[in-house]
């Protein structure tokens, strides 16, 4: 088997808080991978002309529900795509109709953060990459020398100077921060629907383009076209602390609106959601590496979420990709001020700066954080298997609007940002120990007595997840052969997860443990994954502020590791970490090798139901892409 790591030798790993060294093999065995080399994952694809509630849509506005595009997912659901009633890419926003963004559904951002408007949006050209003579290399923040830090400070300082001398200049610091505010807090609408680049498949490409121009602006301000934006290397033990260069008062990189937990050399918790984990720093490091393995290997073997809903823009279902879920959101929260605390200006905190989308860009660290998020996109694809970019044309042809380093407006497409080297930059080669950090069984030996805990039918629907709960659930099949596993993936699905979208949300899922599990230790095979959500505006005008989501976890590998393959019934434990959550139901399903289109094409009025026609095409495309046999 080919190595999944970027180097061929073993990685010598020092813990961030001790001088001890652990050797992590860079060439995992087949059992270390979620997608075993001989597996050929296949999925049932069902295309229905139904609305979100499963009823016939009287307006012929068709939902892309039940289109299965893969198990696990880096990108998330296409739930924020302004398509109206037919399939179409997301167009760039109309800057002339930008609304005042909101911190939440009722509170407006205290300043106007819409981008400067070009004279004529219809004449804004598509961006063309300049010729590349030398790649810009983005370095890890913890390894920068004093000269590089000084150059970085100078670039940010000059960017901030423009806020005073030319406040409407689109390359100024506040104007750059406003980009995230407008795109992420309800500033732009298309056909009456709020454009939201989070909790959707637009997350990675939007932020890549955002940082691309930001980096070029920094380089132009210091006359250095080779300047590379540093990345906060939080996925490696050496980078699991707050980068010191950002914590020097009086410098351009400093931001006073940050939480106290970043100081004193504290290690970052990549699963942080407002409460510090009571554990050792070494355990925190292993938790982080486990989370990275789960998010980039176990739960993201394919581009899109399992049983993915390619929904129309404006859906009430919100599903982020695995990396956006964790570690992206927890890092935002860990750096920002604690919600409800008092800010330096005397106002009550909404998580500013990093802990709220509208203000995140005001912290220079935001861009280094997202530089590493962007790097994860590359690292995920380098892991191999079916980890490739989406080929859906709606995604590839979706567009955004940005200003370049000269203040000129441009439109950009998703399809043009898939290769960083073609864009003119790359990342400094850095070890990725999480690739080999497959957790082992740590709970008590044997199977939990499922007869001593209630069945899922007596637990769900669950009105409030306010304490750890355990339940038993029947599997659709047990003692499956390897051939059956190759053809069908077992998926644990939590449906109708509801919560207030103004709150931080997290709960963890474990298999074969009871409700006394130590949920602060994640480096065990029994840990299946987590659901998280960062406060955001997804639907302006929703008085209930209620978000509805689904969590899907691939458990075939976990059942093998724990030794439960022959069991008809297994125990599942949920541990709430943050926020008020209700869950409608839970089930285990097998993803089946079969194409099922319940639409009768002979009765379609294609001029009215164009999307259903497109859906059938997508179904066939998926079959071809994943080597289905129909």
Curated annotation (Swiss-Prot):
The Gene Ontology terms for molecular function here are: catechol oxidase activity; metal ion binding
Q: What class of enzyme is it?
A: oxidoreductase
Provide the species name: Solanum lycopersicum
Q: What InterPro entries does its record include?
A: Di-copper_centre_dom_sf, Polyphenol_oxidase, Polyphenol_oxidase_C, Polyphenol_oxidase_cen, Tyrosinase/Hemocyanin, Tyrosinase_Cu-bd
Protein name (database record): Polyphenol oxidase A, chloroplastic
Q: Which Pfam families match?
A: PPO1_DWL (PF12142), PPO1_KFDV (PF12143), Tyrosinase (PF00264)
Sequence position, cross-link 2'-(S-cysteinyl)-histidine (Cys-His): 184-198
Transit peptide positions? 1-87
